[in-house]
Structure formats: structure tokens, C-alpha cells
């Protein structure tokens, strides 16, 4: 929090935060020349900033996974509204810049200390673009079930389960599960 204050990043004191990754898809077509390709990320970032400026408080920066967005959700906006704005950004980048942009949105968090985990969920959401498609918003809650806890086995139980699934009849599988 001190660093956010020090650098005047205005996302503190929100109800929750969302992280998103803006990924510019590689184009195989005869597109812009090399100089124009270098300018595309700057233009995409500018479009995102213009769309979100009047909607929510946010910070946007470059990271190893792409253009990263952290948005503050409070009483003046909503998570659903933000997802709609992100979808509009994808459409406008396609229309204006003629580039395909996919925006992956991670889980929301209510504590800033959870941002790194939420960022990882946005990276995970980006991994679904080959299944869901590109040029749109991919929200992690839409593609992954909400975790209810992990199934835990000890080594013996795990071996019994794997053996039953691989080699056993249906009755053996049911017996092993129960």
C-alpha cells in the first residue's frame, strides 16, 4: 500500500479488485510494417485507458504476460460493467487497429495482498483462448469451476483409485470412491 501511495496509483480503498491481461494476438496476415507493429501495444493500451478512464479507478502497465490491468471495483461501478467495457475494448481494437485482442480476467479479490494470486488466475484464463476463442474477454469464472477444495488422497488411496479406474469394472470404481 505504501508503494501505491508513493507512486500515486489511485486504486486503494475499493470493495474489491480485478486483474486482467490484455493480449495482442499474433497476426499472420499481411499487416502493418515493423514500425507500426511496435506501435500497436501503445495504441491498444491507449484505447483501454480511454474506455476505462471515466468508468473506474485502475492502473495499467506492461508485464511479461502482456498489458496488465488492475481495476478497483467500488460503489461507482460493477464487475459486470467492467467486463462489458473490456469486451468493448476488444471490439474497438479490432475495428480501429485491425488487430485481435483477447482480454483475460482473473478472480476478484478483496485484499491487495491477494493480487498476485488473482494475477495468476488471469494468466490461467489466457490459457483458455485456444478453447474459447480469441478477440473477446475470457473471465476465469466462466471457464473454470469455482474451487470447492481439492480432493486429497494418501498414496495408498490414490494408487487404489488409479488402479480401479484403469483396470477395474465399474463396481470396483464405485467401491473405491465410497
Q: What name fits each language-model region?
A:
Residues 1-178:
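Hydrophobic, helix-rich cores of sensory/ligand-binding and other regulatory modules
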